[in-house]
Structures are given as C-alpha cells and as structure tokens.
Amino acid sequence: VYLYTMPKVHVYDLKVQPVVEESLENAKLVLDMEICGKVETVEKSADDAKMQNVSAKITLTGSRDDSKEGAAGSVSENTIFFETISFQPNNTSDTIRFTDTGAATVHFEQQVSHPALWSAEHPDLYTLTVELFDESGNCVEYISQNIGFRRFEMKDGIMTLNGKRIVFKGVNRHEFSSKTGRAVSKEEVLQDIITMKQNNINAIRTCHYPDASGIYELCDRYGLYMIAENNLESHGSWDAASHGLVPKDTIVPGDNMDWEPMMLDRVNSCYQRDKNHPAILIWSVGNESYGGKVIFDMSEKFRAVDPHRLVHYEGIFNDRRYEGTSDMESQMYTSVENIKKFLAEHKEKPFICCEYTHAMGNSCGAMHKYTDLTDTEPRYQGGFIWD
C-alpha cells in the first residue's frame, strides 16, 4: 500500500496501442490520454476549468530494425518521434476534446516504420514518455511507459505472433512466497522470472487473479507471454451442482444477471490497470466457474475494450451453451490421446491446456508426450504446468 500526490493538472489515464500491419513492415502507435484538473489563473473567468496554456510533450524512443532497409546494422537506437500538444480552449484540432468538467481527452496516432518486434525470444521495448507542462512552462508530471510492437492474432484457426505459430511452454503462478506468504518481495519475483527463462519457460498464467504490477513489467522486459486472469473463481458452487448436491441455478454467477454489474466491473479493473503491457497476449475471464450468460458477457466486455487480444476461459468445457466465451479450446489435465481425439472431431479452434501435469512433488512424468504433440498437431499450442 502506498500513497502519492498528484499535481493539479495531471494525466488521469494513458492507453497505448501499438498496431502492427499484417506485412510486419510498419506499425501505428495509437494513444488515448485523459488530462484532468484545473489551472490557477490570475484573472478568473468562465474558462478557469479549462487547461489554458497547458501542454504535453509525447516522445517515443527505442529500436528500429534497419535490416529491413538493407542497412549494414541490424538494430539502431533513436528517437522515433516527438509531438507537442497544446491544451488551449480554442484548439480546433481533432486530436483534443474538452469535456464539460474541463478535462481534456487526447487521441493521437503516429506511423512507425520498420519497428523492432517484441517476442519472448527478442523482447524489444520502446519507451514512451509524456511530459506535462503547466501554464508557467514547468514540468508538473513525467510518465514513462514501456511498450512493445507485436502482432498477435488468430489466423486460420492458429494463434500466431508476428506471423508465426506460437507454442506456450507455460506455468501457472500463484502470488505466494515460501518465506513470507502473500507478501512477495520484488527480489523473489525477479528470481522467479529469471528461473523461468533459464528453464525455457516462455509463458505465465496469473492464476486466478491479477498479480502485483511488477511482474507484468518484468515479463515485458525479459520476454514472457502472459494469460492475464481476471479475479473470478466459484469452484465450490458448480462443483456441488455437478455432483447433484444443489440445483444448477445456484451456480455463481451463472445466468443470474444480479451478478453482472460486479463481474463487468472486475473485468474493467483488470483491463484498465494492465492494458499497455505487450507481454499480455490473452485475457482470461476467470477460473473454474462453470459457464453461463454472465461469463459470456464478461468475455464480450474484454473484446469490446481490446480488439487486439484474445479471450480465454476453460469453463466452456463443462457448459457448452456459450462456446463463444473462449477464443480457444482450453482444458485441464486432458490426456494426449484425448487431445488428439478432440482435435480430430473439433476443428474450429486451437487447443491449449491451461493446467496440466500437476507438478507437485514427484510428478510431471510423461510430459514429453505433450511437448511432442506440439510438433505434430498444429492446433495444439502448448500448455501451462500446474502448480
């Protein structure tokens, strides 16, 4: 827990979407920013709430793949662009919109040629900085945000990153320390990341809630793909219903629309905090909560706010009424033979094991059968070891 103060005029929200063209040759940086607050002026007027004489400088620095232009060098460091935006009430630019409260929204797009693409093998990052200046020209706020250019999509039923089929060699990770319980130090998190990379692990599923922000930043920097999971698990209610102990209409959230506002709020919180991390390829609605209309609507909320990522949910395996909840087939502890059988009968989606091999104690045997399957079955795209 920490407290901090903000200047009277400050950046309330920053959304950055690096959109890479299908050719992978060029990209577009789409930035949406909300500035709020009031500026003190000597002469009070009707425009006091507006941000008179406030400006923002936006700068992108990082790597550029010169090899695409035939240059001798491969990657070069440089300033990609910088832009100064003035928040004048009479500004007629399409970039800026003022609200009734005096806040300003900024929509800004910039072409980037030959970007160095982010991946687990080459986690090339750019640095976006936003400097906010008050009416006296003083820098009152400085924001630095790492961003990565990458193209993740479903193509012909296969998940691809930067035009190539991706295979997840992943683990599930609870936020827990063997020494301090739920209070995990930054040093332990860093050691986790380094250990994963040393063992050829390339992906994390944040089971079953958003983790502390630091691990997302480390995954950006070191190169680990993420399934970022929303805070939802109601294992007990559907487990009891599946054994006939309680009626199915008692499953939470199920089709009970009383739960929907709370669940959509959780999805929004999950998205808003972590939306700018290139490591996040997939949003996960939650874990082991059966199915139903509410969970389907949660998946649609993710898609509405973020069309550049996919959405995951394993629970459709137990409730097939809303197949569209998950963009991929996701199962737990399914044998290799049953994966083959399923894919032979269902060709609509790729398949991942969001939990498999149950690696506690002296276990994890025969894992090679799963890794071998990624070489022979294109639509089997890996899994995440439990625990």
Model-derived segments and spans:
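Substrate-binding/catalytic cleft of secreted carbohydrate-active enzymes
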Residues: 193-196, 203-387
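Secreted/periplasmic carbohydrate-active enzymes, especially glycoside hydrolases
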Residues: 2-218, 222-226, 266-267, 281-282, ...
